[in-house]
Amino acid sequence: MEAAHSVPVQDVLSRFGVAESCGLSPEQVRRNREKYGPNELPAEERKSLWELVLEQFEDLLVRILLMAAFLSFILAWFEEGEESTTAFVEPIVIIMILIANAVVGVWQERNAESAIEALKEYEPEMGKVIRADRSGVQRIRARDIVPGDIVEVAVGDKVPADIRIIEIRSTTLRVDQSILTGESMSVIKHADPIPDPRAVNQDKKNMLFSGTNIAAGKAVGIVIATGVYTEIGKIRNQMVETEPEKTPLQQKLDEFSQQLSKVIFLVCIAVWVINISHFSDPVHGGSWFRGAIYYFKTSVALAVAAIPEGLPAVITTCLALGTRRMAKKNAIVRSLPSVETLGCTSVICSDKTGTLTTNQMSVCRMFIMEKVEGTQCSLHEFSITGSTYAPEGQILKDEKPVRCGQYDGLVELATICALCNDSSLDYNESKKVYEKVGEATETALTCLVEKMNVFDTDTSKLSKVERANACNSVIKHLMRKECTLEFSRDRKSMSVYCTPTGPGHNSAGSKMFVKGAPESVIERCTHVRVGTAKVPLTPPVREKILSQIRDWGMGTDTLRCLALATHDAPVQRETMQLHDSTTFTHYETNLTFVGCVGMLDPPRKEVTSSIEMCRKAGIRVIMITGDNKGTAVAICRRIGIFTESEDVAGKAYTGREFDELSPEAQRQACREARCFARVEPAHKSRIVEYLQSFNEITAMTGDGVNDAPALKKAEIGIAMGSGTAVAKSAAEMVLSDDNFSTIVSAVEEGRAIYNNMKQFIRYLISSNVGEVVCIFLTAILGLPEALIPVQLLWVNLVTDGLPATALGFNPPDLDIMDKLPRNPKEPLISGWLFFRYLAIGVYVGLATVGAATWWFLYDAEGPQVSFHQLRNFMRCTEDNPIFEGVNCEIFESRYPTTMALSVLVTIEMCNALNSVSENQSLLRMPPWLNIWLLGAIVMSMALHFFILYVKPMPLIFQVTPLSWPQWVVVLKISLPVILLDEGLKYLSRNHLEGEEDKK
């Protein structure tokens, strides 16, 4: 039923045709169950194992590799002689890589906690209903509850459906609905209609929402929504409809895959077509078909060479290392690709409570009466330091510390704060912090009493556990609390009846201590306390007090104020009707005003500097809160989102103001806004959508079930460590310390990771370009194979993979947070950089072909044939006069491929050294700045020696050990790549960086 909160209860009962006293008939229950379905959230439809496996092969490069493996397998059947066994190595290795990749992908998806499944944890198993088929209240399974059911809830119960309250059967009804609204304080409910049909959930004080908990009291209500129609069900539907967005890196790699696949296809076709004239060469036995197959194999080798097989593993490893570094900074990353996405975050939408603020209410101002003379009066004003629950801080008057025991008014104020209170402080020894036990507001008063220490209690020798409530305990030993008159909406206050302890004391010394909303309490005051005297409360004095409270409430801090008062001669406790809350207001009359305290949820100390850092980094911070607009704007000014004098028109909106705008106006509002107050979860999702329409990369924080859809929709969903399981499951990152500054540290880490990732992606791609150039050159020039597919796989996966991974440890730039967020559409490799790595790649290709050719032409241990003979090696027969005196088998020697492979590996190690910095010379940024890289290079070379010198590896990789003179040639051919890249870096620094800055 829509807007059930805005109509009288009788209208809701009539709508469902039910009487409060007897409930639904069995026939009505059956009809409603058929109409609305069971009261449960449907389980998530999970993909089958087969679907998950197939998904791992949707990547274009993976498909090309799969095709290459399939073709290699078929071609291996046609091999003859010694090659018939080694021919199977290549397809087997490729298939093993693909299987390993698929297993990891499936395992990650299977183990991902589902936010939708986590929602089901909030469903209660049982509910208490009144139905016509049985007298009294009966317990039934919660899934069997239907709309129209009359339900009873009491303290400790989990609400089984969305319920409109009919009647509250206790003094008050408090509900903890933090999972749904994010509010940390329990909410006091009532049964009266809410006149606003468009009220947000926080304002629907006559509604109970499915999955929330009854903190105190008892009530009866009528079910108005079940299952997917409840507020929590709507959140589930939003999450189902939210398609996860690909991260900028995933999009880049997809684009790269598509471009690379087109290039591979064209180059493979070109190599095959160019060599059609060689299909009938004698080396193929004169068979055109065998020649075609041979060059087809070359094309497959080219495809294998062009694909950076090690890239997915290296990226995963780099991101995993990044997550470890982030975890040390209290940011737990749940989705690896999001590590990189953090680097291009341009907007951070942050909750106020607990993220920008401490979520630890603290009293920062208080006043008592100084003197009252006729119509004139003055106040003693105090400020209090310390912004957490730790009982540490000073009471200051005119910026100077004071001893509270000197002021009689402060002694009485502390007494009221300690006794008119059901909360306490607790020292958590494992976390080493003080925590609240009970309501945040009351805990702030408890903490104030500890800071005031009005009886000068010696706390120096107490442990932190004993220190937590030491001063409160002293006061509680002097006065005994007899009963509590709980808070109620009509009087907006609560009070306690206390009697002095110890012998000789009787009820004659009893007092009633009251705390509550200032207007309500002061209205019932007839006197004010000045020292120990009681002075009549005149209209001018009343106005002075209320004026001070208004200043605190409406000023820059927008403090939450509580008035504290005493009844010096309350009625006898025995005559009080404690079961009837309507009588409480009669007992709380003729009060004496003692003082007032102003409290707030203070901003975290480090937040202001973090927001300034965001401003320098070009990141816009938007505060999104369920709090009222005045408080939200005040906090924004305190932490630097707004300046002190900035006009917030068009920059701060309430949820209602935002809804009243047209869709286009809403979109434009999101472009400028920095504060949204009194918002609901649906607003968060809409804000993310509008920001994404401007190509903003958005990080969104949240902790409640209600935040899950927005967390899922944003590029970076950030859940609080203290948040719900649903929010954590929907998020990419969890802040274990709930601190905004941790987000900024994570963004900084994300930027550093992206810079390092660019370095190793370029490093790997320049290697692949070199391999492609090598195979292309040998095919075009008609030279023997310089590198075979299994060798290419070894280089791409192992020898290149280790240094590439180590490049992830490159130190970040010092000015990394002084730059604007990078454009997510900025290509990984563009313009000059593309030319640079193409130049390096061409050198790699020429060097590998040159090394193989050197062995044929000049090596003392080689055949020393002419270049013409080498180019026509396929025509080599005993009868061909060109090859007179040449043994044709030498063209199948393993030495040239070993030379080429050794040059490729050595050049790549030099190339890794070049990648320590994109533009800085090795003389300015030496390799030992990244000790991991030096270790990786040593390891890669050791593995290369392993396949050359340890049997049976030479047979598998079709290589052979090299002599020392051959190694000298390898080094001579390889080392110039350092000089080449140094020259290109010099051009970058001195000629191109300035031009890019001008752009």
Curated annotation (Swiss-Prot):
EC primary class: translocase
Record InterPro entries: ATPase_P-typ_cation-transptr_C, ATPase_P-typ_cation-transptr_N, ATPase_P-typ_cyto_dom_N, ATPase_P-typ_P_site, ATPase_P-typ_TM_dom_sf, ATPase_P-typ_transduc_dom_A_sf, HAD-like_sf, HAD_sf
Tissue expr: Found in spleen, lung, intestine and brain.
Binding, Mg(2+): D351, T353, D703
Induction notes from the record: Down-regulated by 1,25-dihydroxyvitamin D3.
Ligand binding (Ca(2+) 1): N768, E771, T799, D800, E908
Catalytic machinery residues: D351
Binding site residues for ATP: T353, E442, R489, K515, R560, T625, G626, D627, R678, K684, N706
Record topology, Lumenal segments: 70-89, 274-295, 778-787, 852-897, 950-964
Cofactor annotation: Mg(2+)
Catalytic activity: Ca(2+)(in) + ATP + H2O = Ca(2+)(out) + ADP + phosphate + H(+)
Keywords: ATP-binding, Calcium, Calcium transport, Endoplasmic reticulum, Ion transport, Magnesium, Membrane, Metal-binding, Nucleotide-binding, Phosphoprotein, Sarcoplasmic reticulum, Translocase, Transmembrane, Transmembrane helix, Transport
GO biological process, one term: calcium ion transport from cytosol to endoplasmic reticulum
EC number: 7.2.2.10
Annotated segments matching region Interaction with phospholamban 1: 370-400
Cytoplasmic side: 1-48, 111-253, 314-757, 809-828, 918-930, 986-999
Region (Interaction with phospholamban 2): 788-808
Localization of this protein: Endoplasmic reticulum membrane; Sarcoplasmic reticulum membrane
Activity regulation, free text: Inhibited by sarcolipin (SLN), phospholamban (PLN) and myoregulin (MRLN). Enhanced by DWORF; DWORF increases activity by displacing sarcolipin (SLN), phospholamban (PLN) and myoregulin (MRLN).
GO molecular function: ATP binding; ATP hydrolysis activity; calcium channel regulator activity; calcium-dependent ATPase activity; cysteine-type endopeptidase activator activity involved in apoptotic process; metal ion binding; P-type calcium transporter activity; transmembrane transporter binding
Positions with a binding annotation for Ca(2+) 2: V304, A305, I307, E309, N796, D800
Reported function: This magnesium-dependent enzyme catalyzes the hydrolysis of ATP coupled with the transport of calcium. Transports calcium ions from the cytosol into the sarcoplasmic/endoplasmic reticulum lumen. Contributes to calcium sequestration involved in muscular excitation/contraction.
SUBUNIT field: Interacts with sarcolipin (SLN). Interacts with phospholamban (PLN). Interacts with myoregulin (MRLN). Interacts with DWORF.
Official protein name in the record: Sarcoplasmic/endoplasmic reticulum calcium ATPase 3
Species for this entry: Gallus gallus
